[in-house]
């Protein structure tokens, strides 16, 4: 079963990390990811740019409004995600727990994927 693991953190805290601290955190995360990748359980992994780089499309009528900037009203922002393929929710939660141990703060939301197509492979 495919699961999405969404990574949330206070963006201002992450952006304030020194380059050395950021590289150390990323190295810890890579160490958690590597065994899952070798086992064929880890799909795409993405670290998103800050919300200041976001553009939002909002449909409240016609036409769709395209707006610069983030509009989430949250204390933590979505900073990245993983797409994983585990047999059980417990396995996905265990992986999310390991990611949390490697990352100083934030939250990891695990959600089962309801629909998935990889258009690069569908053709």
Feature roles, as predicted:
Residues 1-123:
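Conserved, structured core segments of small domains
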């Amino acid at each position: 079963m495919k699961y999405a693991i969404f990574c949330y953190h206070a963006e201002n805290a992450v952006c304030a990390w020194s380059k050395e601290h950021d590289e150390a955190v990323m190295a810890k995360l890579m160490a958690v990811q590597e065994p899952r990748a070798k086992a064929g359980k880890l799909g795409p992994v993405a670290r998103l740019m800050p919300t200041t780089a976001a553009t939002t499309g909002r449909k409240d009528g016609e036409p769709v409004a395209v707006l610069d900037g983030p509009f989430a009203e949250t204390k933590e922002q979505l900073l990245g995600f993983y797409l994983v393929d585990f047999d059980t929710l417990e396995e996905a939660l265990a992986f999310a727990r390991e990611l949390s141990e490697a990352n100083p703060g934030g939250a990891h939301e695990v959600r089962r994927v309801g629909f998935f197509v990889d258009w690069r492979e569908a053709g």
